[in-house]
Amino acid sequence: MPHIDVTQQSFEADVIRQSYEHPVIVDFWAPWCGPCRTLGPVLEALADEAKGEWILAKVNTEEAQQLATDFQIQGIPNVKAFVNGKVVDEFAGALPRPMIEDWLKKVVPSSTDKAIVAARGHLRDGAFDAARPVLEEAHVEDPSRIDVRIYLAEIAVHDGKLDDARAILDKIP
């Protein structure tokens, strides 16, 4: 399912509570709005491609006028990103797909970002063996991330493999 239709009654459960598990992208729209009919399918396609990394929630402002008022919707389409129960970013208008993709990168953590958070937790707990495979996978996914290389070098130093640490750090541009 590429999106969920949200009502005034379901907003708390479908958006606010869900946003503690995954980012929720809320599309405020109306059936009569031409730009909304252009933007909607783009957001739905991106949500489908995201495979659960974030949730697309659609609010018909004609049916949920109080939500539109509560969130100060001045014009539609209006898209807001909710994380941990709060709006973290938004845009208005029917942006082209590449601009929406760039916007999503700002508000939805990548799998590499999530891996780094998990690895930092392992490192903080002294669980270097648990952090290593997480960081190695993150490095394969995004070899340009310098922070991943630094953490891998830290693990090598911890393991007494100074030459390995130096080799990892030497590859940083």
Predicted regions and their residues:
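Proteins that catalyze or organize thiol-disulfide redox chemistry
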Residues: 1-51, 65-66, 72, 76-78, ...
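Conserved SAM/SAH-binding loop
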Residues: 61-62
